[in-house]
Amino acid sequence: MFEQRVNSDVLTVSTVNSQDQVTQKPLRDSVKQALKNYFAQLNGQDVSDLYELVLAEVEQPLLDMVMQYTRGNQTRAALMMGINRGTLRKKLKKYGMN
């Protein structure tokens, strides 16, 4: 589950361990760990378009959740994300979310 702390601009990821303890860590830590895992699996192979890969992994759920939060209101969603409405529409189309 993703949450944003009210008093900061840090997105956090909440996890529950086997003792039902909830811990939170910044989303960036989860991204960093995912990249470490990805690089470990490469075994020295070259990779291209890593930026696009990571961006797509974050951008699609971001768009999905913002559109749910705004109940499909693209104007509100674009304002919330700080992007132009036309840019939002282009991104929604890219991921088949239009």
From Swiss-Prot:
GO terms for molecular function: DNA-binding transcription factor activity; sequence-specific DNA binding. Residues 74-93 bind DNA. Pfam families: HTH_8. InterPro entries: Fis_DNA-bd, Homeodomain-like_sf, HTH_Fis, Trans_regulatory_Fis. Keywords: Activator, DNA-binding, Transcription, Transcription regulation. SUPFAM superfamilies: Homeodomain-like. Activates ribosomal RNA transcription. Plays a direct role in upstream activation of rRNA promoters. NCBIfam families: PRK00430.1 (NF001659). HAMAP family: DNA_binding_Fis. Belongs to the transcriptional regulatory Fis family. Homodimer. This is DNA-binding protein Fis. It comes from Enterobacter sp. (strain 638).
